[in-house]
C-alpha cells in the first residue's frame, strides 16, 4: 500500500500528537539535515538574509521539507558556490500523522470493522506551521541575494498553500538590524557567537570589570 497523499493531512484540526512512550512505532522523518552549506562561518561572513515565510496555517510533511531543502541547496551550490551560503530549515516535523488502513480486496467486509476503533497507526510526521512563520532561511553576502531569492522561489513549489519571500533587515540570523549591528560592533558592545551575536551589557560582578568599565556611559545607556 502506497503512502497516502499529504493533501489529506494539510489542515490543522486536532491537538499536537508528538512521539512519546504512548505513541510508539513512529517512522523516522524524511528530513534529517537542517543546516546546509557553510554552517560554521562566523556571523560577520554572511550579513544578508532571505526568508521563506508561510502565509497559511497548515501541516507541512517531512517529505516536503526535505524536497525543499534539496531544491534550495542544489540551486545555491550551482549558482552561488558551495562556500557562499548557509541554509537553515526553521521548522521541525514533530507532529505524528495516523492512518486507519482499509482493505479493498474481495471479502474485506468480513476482515475489518470499518469506523469502529478508527484511531489509526502512525504513518509519518509533519510540522504544524502558522501564518507568518519562517520555513527556510538563507544567509549569504549581498552579492548573492538574487540567487538566494531564486533558490527559495524554487523551494516554494515543494510546499502546499501560499508562501512569501522576504528580504530581512536583520544581520544574518541575528536579532539586530544591519545598522544596529554595525554601530554596536564599532562601539565594541557586541561579541560573535558562532552564527549569532551576543550583546555585552553592564551587568555582572563589578570586581571582575576593568577599571573605568564598571558602568556604561550615559550616552550609551540612553541609546540602549
Swiss-Prot record:
An annotated GO cellular component: ribosome
What does the entry give for GO biological process? Answer: translation
Name of protein: Large ribosomal subunit protein uL16z
Identify the PANTHER family for this entry: 60S RIBOSOMAL PROTEIN L10
Keyword set, alphabetical order: Ribonucleoprotein, Ribosomal protein
Q: Which Pfam families match?
A: Ribosomal_L16
UniProt subunit comment:
Component of the small ribosomal subunit. Mature ribosomes consist of a small (40S) and a large (60S) subunit. The 40S subunit contains about 33 different proteins and 1 molecule of RNA (18S). The 60S subunit contains about 49 different proteins and 3 molecules of RNA (25S, 5.8S and 5S).
